[in-house]
């Protein structure tokens, strides 16, 4: 199964993928991470992002999904994440309408490479961590979460792809997904 894990920052996507790989060693996850990409290219992200950074991220995520075409792959982020953050930048006037439309089309196109989307929503129980790559602004994180919900609802209506929402402890998330992939 080809799975993409999506959600706002500070929800535990990377931790979930690591936990999943421990339980399911037959799965792989692409080696080049989003965090490494941001550092390597000095990209502006979160509230500071713009078209240039989002274009680099979009291409890297597309390449990762296209190149990792095996049967058992789990992705830590995908073009849905890229679209959501681009859309939030669009709402702040940092991304053009043309760019956001192209991002949305590319996001929809990439769904053909996936069989399942795992959404980890924001939880009030999760401690917000601020670092170079995570924004601690609760209002921004809530906006990102709302945009994820909106686009996932649209995807669920338009595409035959399984969308799973996971919450709870690390162990509960793995247990819940295990029931759905076996």
Descriptions of predicted regions:
Residues 2:
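Walker A (P-loop) ATP-phosphate-binding motif of ABC ATPase nucleotide-binding domains
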Residues 52-112:
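Glycine-rich phosphate-binding loop used to anchor ATP phosphates in small-molecule kinases
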Residues 90-153, 164-167:
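A glycine- and Lys/Arg-enriched "phosphate-lid" helix/loop adjacent to the NTP-binding pocket
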Residues 18-63:
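Conserved substrate/cofactor phosphate-moiety recognition/catalytic segment
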Residues 9:
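The conserved Walker
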Residues 13:
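Conserved lysine of the Walker
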Residues 32-33, 76-79, 118-124:
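Short loop/turn segments at strand-loop or loop-helix junctions that form parts
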Residues 5:
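Hydrophobic anchor at the beta1->P-loop junction of P-loop NTPases
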């Amino acid at each position: 199964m080809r799975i993409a894990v999506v959600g706002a920052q500070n929800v535990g996507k990377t931790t979930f993928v690591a936990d999943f790989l421990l339980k399911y060693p037959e799965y792989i996850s692409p080696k080049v991470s989003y965090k490494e990409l941001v550092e390597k290219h000095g990209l502006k992200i979160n509230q500071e992002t713009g078209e240039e950074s989002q274009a680099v991220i979009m291409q890297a995520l597309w390449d990762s999904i296209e190149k990792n075409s095996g049967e058992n792959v789990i992705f830590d982020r995908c073009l849905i994440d890229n679209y959501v953050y681009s859309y939030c930048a669009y709402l702040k006037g940092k991304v053009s309408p043309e760019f956001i439309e192209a991002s949305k089309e590319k996001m929809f196109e990439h769904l053909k490479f996936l069989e399942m989307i795992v959404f980890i929503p924001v939880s009030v129980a999760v401690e917000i961590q601020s670092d170079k790559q995570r924004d601690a602004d609760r209002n921004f994180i809530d906006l990102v979460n709302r945009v994820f919900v909106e686009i996932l609802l649209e995807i669920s209506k338009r595409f035959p792809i399984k969308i799973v929402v996971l919450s709870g402890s690390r162990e509960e998330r793995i247990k819940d997904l295990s029931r759905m992939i076996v």
